[in-house]
Swiss-Prot record:
PANTHER family: OLFACTORY RECEPTOR. InterPro entries: GPCR_Rhodpsn, GPCR_Rhodpsn_7TM, Olfact_rcpt. The gene is OR13C5. Residues 47-54, 121-139, 218-237, 299-318 are cytoplasmic. Its main location: membrane. Residues 1-25, 76-99, 161-197, 259-277 are extracellular. SUPFAM superfamilies: Family A G protein-coupled receptor-like. Belongs to the G-protein coupled receptor 1 family. This is Olfactory receptor 13C5. It is found in: Cell membrane.
Length: 318
């Protein structure tokens, strides 16, 4: 008799901004422009980091990984979100939703871990420059980057399997732009406290641990910078560190707000909370990937020279 109250869902309806056509049009234009900037900025960085031999260093290897990751991260959700803004039928299959959840969580976890690895790389380069070639050899930095991807994939696979095994009732309306794992969990007609606890533990491990490494690394870097006698020599590294910390705090902070609040206790003002989650989505899914190329590399002298060299070579070939 218990199964009579349940139906096997084959698709979900993504509510997004349904009922607000003007907002949908505004968000479509805004997110589309940001997505194009993300593709151009990160694509350029990947291209020059491969083609320019001077950029074949651990730092640019990590930056290339970050750029590729940001393109993948946004592509898992942004195109489908843009289509849903213009379409009256805003549905996604159960299997498509599971794939979207897996890719989204995998990319998010990978980026958190990779940002921690990149902070450690900069700490060694600035605070221990003589030992840098030994510590950050190819045998070290390639496994570091690969490990970030593996951690993200494993964590996401575990989380996604736990969610798709939940029983879902007749309510198939996801109050979000995409299949965010928490938004999908809300639809389960079962106790999700166990899922929330596992998500809390993994988020703490893969978000706060890299964040702690980032804070410690940049604190030591800043202390090392202040030992430089020349104020001119301090200004550029200081501004670079502050800019990078801003991006990291924006990315990690929004994910912290998204995944570490007790969702099972959200009974009052749920509409306001869902609106907040949608706003957070814009920040950590679009803003951070758009800012990363500018903050981490496109202001860098070596990168600017590499871009100029690439353009000159292209014009010469013509």
């Amino acid at each position: 008799m218990e199964w009579e109250n349940h139906t096997i869902l084959v698709e979900f309806f993504l509510k997004g901004l349904s009922g607000h056509p003007r907002l949908e049009l505004l968000f479509f234009v805004l997110i589309f422009i940001m997505y194009v900037v993300i593709l151009l900025g990160n694509g350029t960085l990947i291209l020059i980091s491969i083609l320019d031999p001077h950029l074949h260093t651990p730092m640019y290897f990590f930056l290339g990984n970050l750029s590729f990751l940001d393109i993948c991260y946004t592509t898992t959700s942004i195109p489908s979100t843009l289509v849903s803004f213009l379409s009256e039928r805003k549905t996604i299959s159960l299997s498509g939703c599971a794939v979207q959840m897996f890719l989204s969580l995998a990319m998010g976890t990978t980026e958190c871990v990779l940002l921690g690895v990149m902070a450690f790389d900069r700490y060694v380069a600035i605070c221990n420059p003589l030992r840098y070639p030994i510590i950050m050899s190819k045998d070290a930095y390639v496994p570091m980057a690969a490990g970030s991807w593996i951690i993200g994939a494993v964590n996401s696979a575990v989380q996604t399997v736990f969610v798709v095994q939940l029983p879902f009732c007749r309510n198939n309306i996801i109050n979000h732009f995409t299949c965010e794992i928490l938004a999908v969990m809300k639809l389960a007609c079962a106790d999700i406290s166990g899922n929330e606890f596992i998500l809390l533990v993994t988020t703490t491990l893969f978000l706060l641990t890299p964040l702690l490494l980032i804070i410690v690394s940049y604190t030591l870097i800043i202390l090392s910078i202040f030992k430089i006698s020349s104020s001119e020599g301090r200004s550029k590294p200081s501004s670079t560190c502050s800019a990078r910390l801003t991006v990291v705090i924006t990315f990690c902070g929004t994910i912290f707000l998204m995944y570490m609040k007790p969702k099972s206790q959200e009974t009052l003002n749920s509409d306001d909370l869902d609106a907040t989650d949608k706003l957070i989505f814009i920040f950590y899914r679009v803003m951070t990937p758009m800012m990363n190329p500018l903050i981490y590399s496109l202001r860098n002298k070596d990168v600017k020279e590499a871009v100029k060299h690439l353009l000159r070579r292209k014009n010469f070939n013509k």
